[in-house]
């Protein structure tokens, strides 16, 4: 029984296997028309047919490689009548060729005129390399660029930005060329030479501590390319693990296309680096709001300091604009008229008509000059000493002065009052701009208390509920106890006999008693010092414990015991029984 061959795309060898697999015993039943038709046979029968067939076994893969079994290529004039058998095209070794190096029993014929290639006159064949006995091939030791084995895990750029300029006089390239180096330029570490023989258990290290004049500046390796040396016989060993390279080494270099070296740029970059040292707190809270943009160009000031001989002049960058608090411009008044280049207005007050035709506001007549006042007459009648009369007279003048200041802001005529201020006939509601207190009012020094509301006439009477004896100001929130003028039920009975009855006690209590303080509070240029707030006394008056006690007293609810367990979930007890019994 002859073996039927399959498709001819495989190598021309005897098909079949020594042991047929189980998938080929009944291939027509399981996989019909999918494989080549092949009758099955037993193993012994197959070996008999294989040995009976006499065929020349060729090298494996000869047809599928360069120079394998190909038909003989001959020109048309040399073409034989019958086609010659196939032979090996070329016999010299090629990589991937599965046959023998030098084929035997088959001649090697090469026809160079079939192509444009020309046969070499030096060698006997077309090989460019000489034969091994005549070749002189040697190793070439030349460095080649390499990368560190951990190059993929090394940052390609600088991790932290730098503000140093290559033109800097202290950290730039010019500073690296000077020796000894300034303290602002880092230097390389000391070189270490390790002397150790292979197999020797001891390690000998030689440390070289160079002098300051022989130190080298610190630079990053790998600025251009790393080169490695191959393993040669009589050469140095290669550097297996060089220092980690960086694709962009942060070494500074001067721009050759920019010959102008500007020292201002170096100064600006230095100040820019200093500006990053300012904390966010100092930047946002300066006392006058956030910080304004900084002035980074102070090269002129540093040049002047260098010429004048100042050593170490390197100030911190300052703000371009310093904020200042400017008061608002008044719309009217004395200051507004001065800003508008207008003549300031003078206060015009109506003088009280004199009862004596010979008296003037400044000069009195002869009669009133020598006639004693009512106070002096009362003092003579009561036999009061002269020194007490003098003190009472000073008190009377002081009260008159305060009442005269208060008379500038008199109430309308519908509220007639009986006090010393109504002795002068002044227009009601005078303008503040017509007085000489505009500047004091602008600087918030004229802190006037509102006028007291006196008793009105029966025609203007409005029925109100009876309230406690408090002085009602225009602001209903502020209440105070009655002052000196309201100590008696009727203002008509007010005279100086109350002051003259106890002169010593009145003199001592004028400064200490709160009721005898100036009516207008503090008046500028009135001879009274401005009252100061005692912050320490106010601070000591506060008690944290007392505040907590008042807070706890304000809470009306009962204190909760943290040990009590409050169940905020669903209710499980109904009428004293658990819900389990109701469901079952």
UniProtKB/Swiss-Prot annotation:
Gene Ontology CC terms: centrosome; cytoplasm; motile cilium
Keyword presence, Cytoplasm: yes
Primary site of residence: cytoplasm
InterPro entries: SPMIP4
The keyword DNA-binding is assigned to this record: no
Keywords, comma-separated and alphabetical: Cell projection, Cilium, Cytoplasm, Cytoskeleton, Flagellum
Subcellular location: Cytoplasm, Cytoskeleton, Microtubule organizing center, Centrosome; Cytoplasm, Cytoskeleton, Flagellum axoneme
Any Pfam family the entry gives: SPMIP4-like
Membrane-spanning residues: none
Described purpose of this protein according to its UniProt entry: Microtubule inner protein (MIP) part of the dynein-decorated doublet microtubules (DMTs) in flagellum axoneme. May serve to reinforce and thus stabilize the microtubule structure in the sperm flagella.
PANTHER family in the cross-refs: C5ORF31, CHROMOSOME 7 OPEN READING FRAME 31
Record's protein name: Sperm-associated microtubule inner protein 4
Organism: Bos taurus
The organism's taxonomic lineage, starting at the top: Eukaryota, Metazoa, Chordata, Craniata, Vertebrata
Gene: SPMIP4
